[in-house]
A protein has these predicted regions:
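PRPP-associated nucleotide enzymes
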Residues: 1-334
Length: 334
C-alpha cells in the first residue's frame, strides 16, 4: 500500500446526507481499515423542516479546515427540490469552514437531457452540474457511469468518472466463472454499444446489439439483432439507466425468440420510474443494479454495493502517486 499522504494538513472527513449514510459509513470503514493509524472524520447531516417547505441543513460534526467528501443523492421523487437542498448543504459546509469539498454523487439527475435536440430547450444536465459545482470550495467530483461522456467537459475540472463495467465485470466473472464461454453481452440499443464494448472486452466475451424502432420517449420496438449469435447463450443485457424498463422487457422477449437460454437484465442506475418494478417482475429474468439510487427489496433484484469503489477512488486521491485510472483499468485491488 502506498504511503497515505493527505492533500492538505487538515485531513479529510466523510459527510453524508441521511439516505446515503449506509454507503458513506461502509466507505468510511474501508478507508479507516486501509489508512492505518489515521483518523478520518465522519459526520451526518440533519435536516430540519419548517413551514412553506423550508429546509435547514445541520452538519453534525466539525469540518473546519478539512477536505470534505460529501455523499449526495437524489433519491427523492422531486429532484428539483433535492437540487436546492443539495446547494444549501454545500453552502452550509463551506460556511462551516471546510477547506475543500469533493462531491461524491453516484448519479446526477437530468443526464438524458445532455444536448439540444430541438430549438428553445435547455441542456438540463449542464445546468445541474454547474449548479452543484459553482461553489468556491467545491474542487472535485466523483461520479459513476454518466449517460454521456461529453458531460465531463461541463465540470470545472474533469471528474473522477467511474464507468459501469468496473462494477459489473467482477460480478459477471464471479457469477458465470465456469460458463464464461456461453456469455454474450447485449446492448439494448445502439447508444450503449461503446459502453458495452468495454464491458465485453473486460470479461472477454462477444457482443451484440439490438436495433430499435423508436416511436417516442420510452416507447421502442426491437426489430433486429446485430453481432454475436445468442442462440443457446447466457445473455447479459446492460445499460446505464433502468427507468420504465419497457425496452429491457422487450429485449428479453426478443432474445428468447432468438433462442437465448438465459437472460440477465443489468443497469447501473435503478431509476425505476412508472411501473418499472411490475414490468421487470413480469419478465421473470433476474435484474442486477447498483445502489446508486435506493430500491425496494425483491427476490429477483440483486444490488451491487458501490462503497468499495468509491472508497478506493477517495483513497487514490490521498496517497502518493495515487491513480483512479488504476481502479478503472485493473478493478479493486485484491
Amino acid at each position: 500500500m502506498p504511503k497515505y499522504k493527505p492533500r492538505h494538513p487538515g485531513g479529510m472527513t466523510i459527510v453524508t446526507t441521511p439516505s446515503m449514510a449506509p454507503m458513506a459509513k461502509q466507505a468510511h470503514e474501508i478507508l479507516e481499515s486501509k489508512i492505518k493509524k489515521k483518523s478520518i472524520g465522519y459526520a451526518e447531516i440533519k435536516y430540519d423542516s419548517f413551514s412553506r417547505c423550508e429546509v435547514l441543513p445541520i452538519i453534525q460534526g466539525n469540518v473546519r479546515g478539512k477536505h470534505v467528501y460529501l455523499f449526495l443523492d437524489f433519491n427523492g421523487n422531486d429532484w428539483m427540490r433535492d437540487m436546492f437542498v443539495s446547494q444549501l448543504t454545500i453552502s452550509a459546509i463551506q460556511d462551516a469552514g471546510a477547506d475543500k469539498i469533493t462531491l461524491v454523487i453516484p448519479t446526477f439527475p437530468g443526464q438524458r437531457q445532455d444536448r439540444k435536440d430541438r430549438s428553445r430547450v435547455p441542456i438540463s444536465a449542464k445546468v445541474v452540474i454547474q449548479a452543484l459545482t459553482n461553489f468556491e470550495t467545491v474542487v472535485h467530483v466523483i461520479t459513476l457511469d454518466m449517460h454521456a461522456e461529453q458531460l465531463e467537459a461541463v465540470f470545472p475540472r474533469a471528474p473522477d468518472h467511474l464507468p459501469g463495467f468496473v462494477i459489473f465485470a467482477p460480478w459477471i466473472l464471479e457469477t458465470f466463472h465456469d460458463r464464461m464461454d456461453q456469455v454474450v453481452i447485449v446492448c439494448p440499443d445502439a447508444g450503449s454499444v461503446k459502453r458495452n464494448q468495454r464491458l465485453a472486452k473486460r470479461v472477454n466475451v462477444p457482443l451484440c446489439f439490438l436495433e430499435k424502432n423508436r416511436k417516442g420517449r420510452g416507447d421502442n420496438d426491437v426489430i433486429a439483432i446485430h453481432g454475436a449469435d445468442v442462440e443457446g447463450k447466457i445473455c447479459i443485457v446492460n445499460d446505464d439507466l433502468l427507468d420504465t424498463s419497457g425496452t429491457m422487457a422487450k429485449s428479453g422477449v426478443t432474445l428468447l425468440d432468438h433462442g437465448a437460454s438465459e437472460i440477465h437484465l443489468t443497469g447501473t442506475h435503478p431509476v425505476f420510474g412508472g411501473d418499472a418494478y411490475e414490468t421487470l417482475a413480469q419478465t421473470g429474468h433476474p435484474v442486477v443494479v447498483t445502489d446508486s439510487l435506493a430500491t425496494r427489496e425483491h427476490d429477483w433484484l440483486t444490488v451491487l454495493p458501490l462503497a468499495p469503489y468509491l472508497a478506493e477512488a477517495i483513497l487514490q486521491n490521498n496517497i502518493e502517486d495515487g491513480s483512479v485510472s488504476s481502479l478503472i483499468l485493473n478493478g479493486l485491488p485484491t
